[in-house]
Amino acid sequence: MHCPFCNAADSKVIDSRLAAEGCQIRRRRECISCGERFTTFESYEVVMPRVIKSNGKNEPFDEAKLRRSLMHALQKRPVTQEQIEAVLSDIQLKIRRLGERDVKSRMIGEIVMQALFALDHVAYVRFASVYQDFQDVEAFRRQIEQMQQREQECEKHDV
């Protein structure tokens, strides 16, 4: 690691600690040339798979796009920013756990729908209406009926 003070190439680590809830390593270093001390942080690189769109094109995974979709579906809903961040992280974790280099946008949509179903049913229907391209009120009605059936099945298994 180059020294930020004298740009010498050699430094020694004098202390290492976990930081950022175990996601980073904080290292205290000392320059061998000038003796100045400085801190560095080391973290892993998270590589998300590429997204294969329905038209066959592929593009890099875009966290900002996912966040906008969630925020739009959750607009004016009683959901905290912390809950949104947790859902966002959970969705990305599930996508990474697929273990694929390329993931179809349809699969990502299904993962998002599962997360929204668990978080807020209104947001789930909002997202589904865009994602599944509802054309009329009947499509909304069918989606809500499916959601209610799913809820009843979950309640039966919980008892």
From Swiss-Prot:
GO MF annotations, alphabetized: ATP binding; DNA binding; zinc ion binding
NCBIfam families in the cross-refs: transcriptional regulator NrdR
Family to which this protein belongs: Belongs to the NrdR family.
Function, as annotated: Negatively regulates transcription of bacterial ribonucleotide reductase nrd genes and operons by binding to NrdR-boxes.
Name used for this protein in its record: Transcriptional repressor NrdR
UniProt cofactor note: Binds 1 zinc ion.
Domain (ATP-cone) ranges: 49-139
Signal sequence extent: none
GO BP: negative regulation of DNA-templated transcription
PROSITE patterns given in the database record: ATP_CONE
Cofactor needs: Zn(2+)
Keyword terms of this UniProt record: ATP-binding, DNA-binding, Metal-binding, Nucleotide-binding, Repressor, Transcription, Transcription regulation, Zinc, Zinc-finger
Organism (species): Acinetobacter baylyi (strain ATCC 33305 / BD413 / ADP1)
One of the Pfam families matching this protein, by short name: ATP-cone
Keyword ATP-binding among record annotations: yes
ZnF start-end (unnamed): 3-34
PANTHER family on file: TRANSCRIPTIONAL REPRESSOR NRDR
